[in-house]
């Protein structure tokens, strides 16, 4: 049973998404709180499932497939909802677009490389990017309540969330470049073999 826990956590993260969307649209404090808690649970299971899989020696093909999909679904859903409700607005939308575009590009690149039996390992910088994304989205989801709790002069939860969103977008560009360079190098080396 313990060996199945990482995959159960990953699948659970996907199952959380519709409930997260419903909670996001619940009015008031309890809606904000419920959406935030569900996002935190999803973010924590992202860390936990990989760690458990490595600890238990249960890294599986299913986990390799579903983990990045689950990550992208929760992040993309949260960013789209935050843009739709105006929390992320104006030029800040560019940061969300950068993040979403990178996720699509890198997913395609991973798929392309997988055909050649080449794995694209997650870099430490990409892990940092993910942590910053999760924290920024969590702060942005915290709404007015978060602003009351986190408020240092001109920096409240929303402002800090936007700053971290831009930082994660910058890391997103850097890691996308790194992954694309590796992918292009591989594609060119394959072309040279022909």
Please describe what each predicted stretch is:
Residues 1-7, 17, 27, 35-43, ...:
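C-terminal membrane-associated helical module and adjoining short loops/tails
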Residues 15, 44-52, 69, 73, ...:
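Active-site His/Glu-centered metal-binding helix of metallohydrolases
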Residues 10, 60, 123:
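Residue-level signal for threonine
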């Amino acid at each position: 049973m313990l060996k199945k826990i990482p995959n159960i956590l990953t699948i659970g993260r996907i199952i959380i998404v519709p409930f997260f969307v419903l909670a996001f649209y619940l009015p008031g404090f309890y809606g904000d709180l419920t959406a935030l808690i569900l996002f935190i649970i999803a973010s924590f299971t992202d860390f936990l499932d990989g760690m458990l899989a490595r600890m238990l020696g249960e890294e599986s093909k299913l986990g390799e497939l579903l983990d990045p999909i689950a990550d992208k679904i929760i992040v993309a859903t949260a960013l789209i909802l935050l843009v739709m409700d105006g929390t992320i607005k104006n030029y800040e939308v560019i940061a969300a677009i950068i993040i979403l575009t990178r996720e699509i590009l890198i997913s395609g690149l991973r798929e392309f490389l997988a055909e050649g039996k080449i794995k694209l390992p997650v870099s430490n910088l990409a892990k940092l990017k993910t942590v910053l994304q999760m924290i920024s989205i969590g702060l942005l989801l915290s709404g007015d309540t978060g602003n009351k709790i986190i408020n240092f002069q001109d920096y409240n939860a929303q402002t800090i969330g936007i700053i971290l969103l831009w930082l994660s977008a910058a890391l997103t560009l850097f890691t996308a470049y790194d992954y694309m360079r590796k992918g292009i190098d591989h594609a060119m080396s394959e072309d040279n073999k022909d």
